[in-house]
Every structure is written in structure tokens, then in C-alpha cells.
Amino acid sequence: MIDLNEAEKEALDFASRALQSKNSRTPETIRKLVEAAAIMAATTQPGLQVDVDALVAELGHAASVWTETPVVLSNFRVKPWWFEKKPLIEPMRFWRRYRRYLEQEKNLRDRDLDAVDEQTDSIIDRIQDPATTGPWDIRGMVVGSVQSGKTANYVGVISKALDAGYKIVIVLAGIHKNLRAQTQERIDEGILGFDSQHRMDQNREDYRIGVGKLVMPELGLPPSITPLTNSSINGDFTAGAQTVTASLSGGPIILVVKKNKSPLKNISKWLEVASGQLGHQASGTPISGLPLLMIDDEADNASINTKDRPNVEDDETNITTINKEIRRILQRFEQSAYIGYTATPFANIFINPEADRDEEGKDLFPRDFIVNVRPSSRYVGPAKVFGYSRDLLVGIEAAAPLPIFRPVNDHELAFPLKHKGDHDPGELPASLKEAILAFVLACAARRVRGQKKAHNSMLVHVTWRTAVQQKVRKIVEDEFHRVRRVIHYEKNHPVWEQLKALWEEDYSRSSTKIRELENDTRLSELTWEQVSAELAVAADKISVREIHSESTDELAYNREPEGLSVIAVGANKLSRGLTLEGLSVSYFLRTTRMYDTLMQMGRWFGYRDGYLDLCRLYTTEELRDWFSHVAFAEEELKREFELMADSRMTPADYGLRVREHPDGMLVTALNKMAHGESREVNFSGRLVQTAFFSRDAQVQTKRADFVERWVSSLGCFRTDKWGGLRWTATRGDVLALLDAFRAPGFTHPKCTHFGPELRSFIEAQQENGGLAEWTIVIPSGSRKVAQIADYPLKLVKRPDVSADQKYYSLSKANVQDPAHEILDLDEIELTEEILDDVLTKLELRLGGPPVPLIRPGEQQDAVTACIGRSVAEAVVALGEVRGRRGASAIRDEIRQLRPVSRGLILIYLLDTTDVEGLNDVRFVPALALSFPATNMSKRLKYKVTPTWIKGQLQNYELEESPDEED
């Protein structure tokens, strides 16, 4: 955002509020509002000028920003309470102070503030009302995006939780001191209102920060809260902190700690002593009446129990220390709520949902809720930076990348992929020298746009070795000092020509393109003359720092009111949570094959208001392609969250999956996904069926009515010689049917194969002429008669084997009769060649001769008799020889015979007279889709959770016929 004087702030605030009530948000409307607001501000702030054009651009951008409603997946174990209690909490000091702070100090507009309010409301309503008595233990997860404002979100959640009555808040803030201290500073600003290093002098004006500086007399006295940690680099909960005199029975307490064995153990010891003071003398007795809220920032890092293995006996050796200590702290409280925050939930979804231990309790799987918080439209995420290709099979459209990537291919000598700690980079590659020039240009251009007090950062991430980082810092600093000297004193130096060429041939062109793509009115067009005039001042503000465990350098942005401009050389400390404010140029060569680690290293994601066109990412083409793949996998996983929410499934019941990389990248570390398995998703030569149905009679009546209307729309039917009715249908007809069956409530959420992939698979075959024609068959049963398309047809009986109050389930998750799958093959003549082909495939599948299928004598005669008859008749004949298992045994091979242009849908009309909840429904329709085998379809590999595997039973055909009641 541009630097604003008091008159401009007042004018922008007035115009922004006025715009909320306007239906029209055209540029003309916005300009009129700003001009009127400028006149008003001139009377209240005499002597200060208002830049109307700048405010019009600022407000125009804000008006075009939108934020999606968060996607919430819940087990509904917690009764909604927050929206009923919220109006009764007066005056909500913590939240109202924090909202005002975001508005005045962080310059969030009303729309953004409302989004934070709505998101935090959704989350707080999923944890328990702290006034609820008795034992309760809530486990949830909030999924955001890298650098999208997760900290602001959970500070908002904490503020509302404190207003609601939570007594103890513990924030687990990463694994590094710097990140813990940075998080503590955010808590100081948003919750405490004073520098926690000076708690005893918190009322001194010079120690008050953030919300503590606000003047809000309507709230009365500031809310009271005691921090047991502070913002100094060593302000963690140490062994000495165990002796603190803060009483658990007093006001609320907050701690911000590293995810490290020592501070976590210190908390456990302190709680043991403090609970004894409250009268909980018995060892292990939970603390009651003091509800705990634990926020786990970067919950996929260090919190996961990486020693948990399937089929391994539970003992002290298969739980990691940090995971154990977190769970033990939660166990100390009779009432607790745990919320894990992460932008890369790839590891969290593979936590064993059934893990439970006597001392530590249940693992950290988010069994109660998952909230997927989508960032606002102005967020620059992986899809915008790297893009990805269209994938028809899963229904995801292509995302075009912004033109900010610059390829690096000259780094091998200076920064080889593999190197030792004594490696000497020597001279900087030309690509890094160019990146330094790009950063100086970006800093100067932001000054031209009025962002003179803005922070500016450049990331140099080329090695994880500390000793090499120190050398890199030195040569980067030498190069930057050379550039700065030239800017000041050598106007005819070639560097000036390089700067001018970089601006005119790169920045000017790409800025125009980005301005068009983003429709950002604040990305004003700049000339070389304007930018070059600011180069010297911009360069003077830049410093080079190394950020790692052995360096004393810090990124103390909050201590630089005039703005900090820094080139940060580092690795691990810059890869997790630590924010690089105003990051515009990144030079990144560090490789990792893990999705989550790679994505967290991408510090260039986030909000780049007013300077997105100045951003550059220098990296290799291979890394760009890796990021693109992970961006797609992330988008697909978040689509899964949306499907889960639509189906009203609980996190514990809905299996999740993540797309695997074809060339060896890992979803996450192997020890974090011990409970995951690889699976292929493809419908070629497969049977897909529905076997779980809602017991809601109204839903099933609507679906039955739809099916009747749908088959009637297909035109005239013909009666099938095998019994039942038959139609032909087009691809479009079939897609309409599937869309209806995917509607919430129609099909059990475990029927995940009826998701978008099924529809997209059918659509994708269009390019190859596949699945253009469909045979629709409604088989006749042996039960009561119902009218369908004005024809009396006997219904099919399938017993209910479920005790679930909501869903009717079929035995073996199977509705289809194997003999019915050949009903559309009666026009194909069985030849010796076809039969030999089928039997050969069967032999290969079974790993030996198909002895059970054909034996000498009577069975051989039966096979010979099949020649010249239709494939359908032949299968029935073979089935008669072997019993009803005949069709089932060879149906995989039979699908090889179906033309790729033709699919089969069997619609079973189920008699539910004896099914609880559905007794009076005339019938419940169930589908079975049989797909021809084709080599033209793409196979997708996923890493899947155990719950996903359980939920896919109905994807796999069983040899047995379905259970029937005659």
C-alpha cells in the first residue's frame, strides 16, 4: 500500500465506507466518492494534500478484491454455539481491539476485515464453548496457503476464544528461535498490546504497541492477560519459568513456545505443580474448569508422530518426543481444543486417525473439523506463479502463470547441487548479478509509486550449508556494494546500461502484461527516467544479511518505521514461517523432492499489493516444473476438501488422497506417511456402482422421480429378452444422470468414485471417440411391481446390512448381478478367436490355466456349443456350467470385448419395503456403470489414506453375486 498522510487516510476510509452502500462500483463512481472525501478531509486536516489519483487506484483495487467463504468439514460433535453466544459477550475487548488494529495499522479494508471475521467465526464455532462442563477434547485443522495470513487468522481466533472464556492459550510457533520470537511479536501486537519483554512496565507509553496504542474508551479498561513468554530471542518457556507465580485460577494466560522438547517438558512440569495448587493432588488428575486452546502453527512440521507404523506393537519407542509432549499437555486438561494451522497438510492427512495411547491420548489427527481458508483474490499463490496444465480427468482447468519466472542455467559452477561445507562459490553467476540489479530497480520503482516507507526484501537461497551461506553473503555483499558505488559515482559505467535495459526490455513489458491480467489499478506505468531518479536513495537503504542459526543478523521489520530493505541470504530459517516482508526478488536453487518442503520454501507467495509487476523469481526450469506439479496437487487436494464438505462427511470418515509425481517426488517425508499407500485411479475396464443410500425418504422420492423423467426423455424403450427395459443414450444424457446422482444427499459420501473424475473421464474420451454411445438397462427383478415409464416392472431386492441411522447399505457393497453386465453384448458373435483371447487373458490374470472354467468332457462340449452364438449367450452358458460364478469370473475379460465407443449403465430399482426409513418409497434407484477397456485413458497415481482405501470397497467388483431376498 502507498504511504498515506492523515488526510489521505481519512479520505480513503470515508470513500471506502461510502462505497459499501453503492451497487455500482465503476471507476467513475469511485472517483466521485474519492473527490468528495478529499474535500471533506481538507476541512478536518488543513494543510495536508490529498493525492486523488493514488486514492482512486487504491480504492479501485480494493473494490475488485473478493474472498471465498471458508470450506468447513465437521463431524458435528460440537453443537453450534458461537453465533448464539457472540451477541451476549460485552464488549468483546480482545476481538474489537484486534479488528481495529487490522483496520488502522494494517490498513485492511472493510471487505478484508469482514473476511477475517467470518473465517474466525467459522473456526471458533467448531471448538467447544468454554462454559461447557464435563470432559471434552477437540482436534481440528485450519488449512491456509503459504504466506496468506495464517498468523492474522489465528490471532483473531485467539482473541475471540479469550472473549468467550478460554483461560489458557498455548501457541506452538515453529522450531526456530527467530520464528518463535516473531510469532510472539504478533501476539504482543494483536493480543497483549505491550512488548512482552517489559511485562512489569506494560503501562509505560513507550512499551505499548499494536492494540495497546489504540484509543477505544467504549471498551473500558484494557483486557487483562498474562504472558509467560516474551519476544526476546531467548524468551521461551525455560526451566526457570516453571517458578512463575502466575496462578491458573487468575486471569487468562498465554504462552508462545518453540516446538522443542525442553519448553514443552517445562510446561508439563509447571502444569503439574500448578494443578496441585488448585487441589488436583492425585497424579494424572486432569485440570478442570480451565479450558485450554492450543494453536499449532506449521502443524505439519515436528508435530507429526513419524515413528507410528502400521502393524507395529505400541510401546515407548514408536512415538516421537515432540508429538508425545504435545499430547501429554492436552491430556493434562479436562477441557481442551487443539487447532493445527498449516499451508501444506500433506503430512497431516496421513496421521493414523485411530492412534490412541494411555498416557498421551489420541493422536493429532483433525477428527473434529478441517477448515479450508481460501485466500482473497489478490493472493499470489502457486497457481499464479507457476501455473499448471488442464486436466480433463479430474476437471481442473489450466492456470496461466504470471510472467515473473526467469530461468537460471549458469549456476552449476558457483552453486552445484551437491557440495561440501568447504565449497567456495567463487564469482557470482551472471543470473544472480542480474537478480541484484532487479531488486534495486524494484525498490526504486516502489518509491516512485509512493511506497517509500515500505519494507523490501530479496531472498537468496542457494545452499543449506551454513559455512557456504557465509561465503555467499560475502560475495553478494561485495557485488551489491559495487553496484551501489556505480549508481552513485559512475554514471557512464556499463551497470547503468544493464539497469536501463533490464527496466525497458523486461520490467516495462511484463508490467503491462501483469497489469492486464490482474486488473490492478495501482500498478501504474513507470518510465526509466522516474525509476532511475530513485535508484541512489533506494540503494542506500539496502543491506545484506545472513539468516541462520550461527548468525546474529535479524529481520526486525517492526523496528524499522522508515522501512527495511534487505537482501537475505539463508536457507532453513527462511523456509518455515519466517516472513520476508515486501519480498520482490527471489533467487532460489535449493532442491527437495518433498511437496510440503518445496512449497514452504516458496516465500515468494503472498500478497504483493502495488508491486506484483516488480516481482521476479530466478530459478531452474526443473524447479519451476516441480512447483507447477505441486501447485496442481495442492489445488486437487483442496477440491477434495470441498467435496468432503459438500457430502457432509467427517474428517475421520472421508478418505483423502494426493496426486503423486511421475518422476519420483514425494508427497511428504516417508516417515510422515507410513499409513499411506499408492493407488491408481482409472475407470478403463472397470465397474463403478452405488451401494450406499440416504434413508431420507424425501431425497429418494426425488431421485426416483428424476430417474423416471430421465429414462422417459431417452425416447422409446424396448423390452429386453433377458427381462427388463433397454434404451440407448448419448454422452450428454449420461453426464446429466451422473450430475443428479452426485448431488448432496443422493449418494453416500463414501461413493467417492462418483466425484468429478468419473464425469471428467467420460468427457475426456470424447477426444478419441470413446463412450459416445451408451446402453441403458433396467433389469427386471422378482419382487413387487412398480411403474417406470408407464411400464410395469418387477423390483429388485437387496437387503439392508447397515446399522447406520442415515444410510442404507448393501451387502458386500455390491448392487450389480454379474450376469447383467453382458446384456449389451448380445449382438457380438462369439468366435473361436474371441473365446481364445478371453481365455488367454483369464489365464494371465489368474496366473495359470483356467482349469476352474473349462474341463474336459461335459464342460468342453458346453464351450464348443457356444461358438457362433452371441457373447452374451456364451457367457450365460459358461455360467451355467460353473454355476453363477461364471460371468463373475470372466467379466474383466468380457469388458475387453465391449467397443471403446460404448458404455453400459444398469439401473436397479430397489424394493425398500423392509428398509427402515424407506418403507413407503416406491423404489430406490441404484447405478452400475460398466466401462470398456481402453488404452487411451491416462492412469493417475495417488498416495491415499487408509480411510480412502476403506471407502473404495465399492470400486472393486466382488466375485460373489449380490445378496438377494426371494
Give residue ranges: language-model regions:
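Low-complexity, highly charged intrinsically disordered N-terminal segments
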Residues: 18-133, 184-189, 195-289, 293, ...
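Walker A/P-loop
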Residues: 136-154
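Walker A/P-loop NTP-binding motif
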Residues: 151-165
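Conserved C-terminal RecA-like helicase domain
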Residues: 196-232, 285-286, 290-300, 306-311, ...
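Conserved P-loop NTPase catalytic core
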Residues: 198-211, 290-296, 305-446, 457, ...
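C-terminal catalytic or substrate-handling cores of phosphate/nucleotide-
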Residues: 258, 270-274, 417-447, 463-466, ...
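Conserved RecA-like P-loop NTPase helicase motor core
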Residues: 332, 544-627
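C-terminal accessory/interaction regions of large nucleic acid-associated machines
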Residues: 591-612, 730, 739-966
